[in-house]
C-alpha cells in the first residue's frame, strides 16, 4: 500500500479581463507554440464579435454554448476476450467541459475563412442556438453510447 497521498485537483485560474474560468480554459486550449498573448487576442476578439452579433452578454452565450455541447456520456474502447468493445461511461463535469471546449475549437477550425476569432464566435453562437458541428459531435457520441448500451456492464 502506498504511503503517498492523492494529488489535489488543480482549479483552473480565471482570465484577467472577464474573471472567468471558462475563458481561461478556452485560452489554454487554443494556445499554440506558447503564444498565449495571441490566444488571448483571439478569444477577446471572438467575445467582442459575439457581443456585436447577439447584443447580449457574450459570457452567457459562451456558457450556454459549452453547456449545450458538454456530453453526459461517452464511449471508451475496452478489450474483452480478444475483441474490443465500445463501453459507454459517464463523464464528470470537468472532463465534459474540457471535451466540449475541444470540440468547439475543432469545429471552428474546420469552418471556412481565415480569421479564427470570427470562426470561433460563429461556432459559439451556433452552439448556443443548438446547431453547429460541435453539437452534431455531441449527438454522435450520445448515439454511439446508446448503441453500445449492452456493453455497459464491462466497466
Swiss-Prot record:
User: Keywords, A to Z?
Assistant: Chloroplast, Plastid, Ribonucleoprotein, Ribosomal protein, RNA-binding, rRNA-binding
User: Which species does this protein come from?
Assistant: Asarum canadense (Wild ginger)
Assembly behavior: Part of the 30S ribosomal subunit.
Q: Which InterPro entries match?
A: Ribosomal_uS7, Ribosomal_uS7_bac/org-type, Ribosomal_uS7_CS, Ribosomal_uS7_dom, Ribosomal_uS7_dom_sf
Instruction: Give one Pfam hit by family name.
Output: Ribosomal_S7
Protein family per UniProt: Belongs to the universal ribosomal protein uS7 family.
- Main location group: plastid
**Cysteines engaged in disulfide bonds, as pairs:** none
The record's gene field reads rps7
Question: Where in the cell does this protein reside?
Answer: Plastid, Chloroplast
HAMAP family xref list: Ribosomal_uS7_B
Keyword rRNA-binding carried by entry: yes
Highest taxon of the lineage:
Eukaryota
Query: What molecular functions are annotated in GO for this chain?
Result: rRNA binding; structural constituent of ribosome
Name the chain's protein: Small ribosomal subunit protein uS7c
* GO cellular component, as recorded: chloroplast; small ribosomal subunit
Q: Name the job this protein performs.
A: One of the primary rRNA binding proteins, it binds directly to 16S rRNA where it nucleates assembly of the head domain of the 30S subunit.
Biological process per Gene Ontology, one example term:
translation
Amino acid at each position: 500500500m502506498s504511503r503517498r497521498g492523492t494529488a489535489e485537483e488543480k482549479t483552473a485560474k480565471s482570465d484577467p479581463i472577464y474573471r472567468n474560468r471558462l475563458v481561461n480554459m478556452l485560452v489554454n486550449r487554443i494556445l499554440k507554440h506558447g503564444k498565449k498573448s495571441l490566444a488571448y487576442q483571439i478569444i477577446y476578439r471572438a467575445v467582442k464579435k459575439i457581443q456585436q452579433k447577439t447584443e447580449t452578454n457574450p459570457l452567457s452565450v459562451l456558457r450556454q454554448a459549452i453547456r449545450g455541447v458538454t456530453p453526459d456520456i461517452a464511449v471508451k474502447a475496452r478489450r474483452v476476450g480478444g475483441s474490443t468493445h465500445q463501453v459507454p461511461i459517464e463523464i464528470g463535469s470537468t472532463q465534459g467541459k474540457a471535451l466540449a471546449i475541444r470540440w468547439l475549437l475543432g469545429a471552428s477550425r474546420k469552418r471556412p475563412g481565415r480569421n479564427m476569432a470570427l470562426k470561433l464566435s460563429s461556432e459559439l453562437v451556433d452552439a448556443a442556438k443548438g446547431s453547429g458541428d460541435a453539437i452534431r459531435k455531441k449527438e454522435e457520441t450520445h448515439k454511439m453510447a446508446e448503441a453500445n448500451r449492452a456493453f455497459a456492464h464491462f466497466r
